């Protein structure tokens, strides 16, 4: 039986490196472990010098049986290391084929994209004169969301700088903690909302107040989660159906307020407020119960917590009863940096960081974060000036193209969407970091580095994924009911985005593709290849499965955001033709190569760790 070294007392001095080495040596060899009492009885009083003497005795083979066992262990280690090296060499050898293929693939995609954009630009909607100077290079601003964000960027940047400076001054000179900062953010965010929504702020405050009363009255009841969901889904649907309501429905003497509805539709932003209201309700409900997280066990496993910093998981599990006030609640719902587009942060995590500002990012880190955003923005500008992917999708001109060009446009649209959301979400997260509140990072991984649906959704709207896991997936039964939960979760995600049939179709298509992946992944996790050939075949099958998954993911997203359900049959018929089948095969081969490259990236990360 192995001794528990964590309970061994090495005198009153701090353990030296030599002492640690002795313990590791004893742990590695059972013959030493069986003689542990004799070794520990050495008259050393726990000093490093005496431990050095014991280690010398051990390494000089004065303990019987040590040399034989050491030789056997060394042989086993050498054999394992040799196999690992051979495996790494064979996998690295793949790069000789994979990297040139990827380079040729992207050169071809870029050249063909330039060609079709140049040939059809006169038929496309949403192109505007750009800043490259040549009339040949127009800017694709056909996406309304990107166009609005881009045009409002100067005024947003002024507001960002002003709010960040005021927050810093207020906290520094008034030494404000959670209560003071909540008052500050409530006041300044309310002014921000008056500019955005005008008189419609009345609707926001009314619904938020009703939700607060519901939480405070029923949070101790077992049926509270059901009430919370019914209330919030009811208003989510009503806001969309009635398009934010008209003041005239309350009487003609209120109709004049419809002339003061602000510059931004309030019911669009309110989708994020719905998520925050549910978060507040659940966090308060759980605060009245016992803690659900073993903090000591978490700290032992979490690398962020081990480094002396506080991770997001700990922040969102901090239940401080004094934080659940109406002022803190409203400041959380209306917090200006994250109000328009997120990222989504839980109530507990927000309240904790008003008390003590985030320490994960230093001033230098935040500055570098902002600089990287500027580089990414310039990349987006270059992309929209050269490639008109979204304009093809909006104009419907893609239906006139060949199957190869349809694939290129579809692939380009997904990359455009990824970069668009990447820039929007990181801009507002940068603003929040400047103000001392860290929200989860959306888009932590590139779109082209996700070879399965689970990885894709964890790394797309990542903060929303964390929210769904915490407030839907786990309460609905977690992994035990995973095959059923996915339908409820993705249907909610579709309805939350908008009341459109094509989004419902996207959600259900995603579920249909998700379920086989979950079944296969569950079987793959329990499979252990015993031979080199077995590992090779398993890796090849995984790469092929990744290629199919990426293809399904493209189809689901094109249905949801571009062609709609009615375009599925047309798309399938296009690729079943004599011209389309070679494109389909080439697409699968390209995605297979891409998946193998993703495996190489993951292997490199594991080696670094």
Identify the meaning behind each predicted range.
Residues 2-31, 35-609:
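Non-catalytic, membrane-anchoring transmembrane segments at the edges
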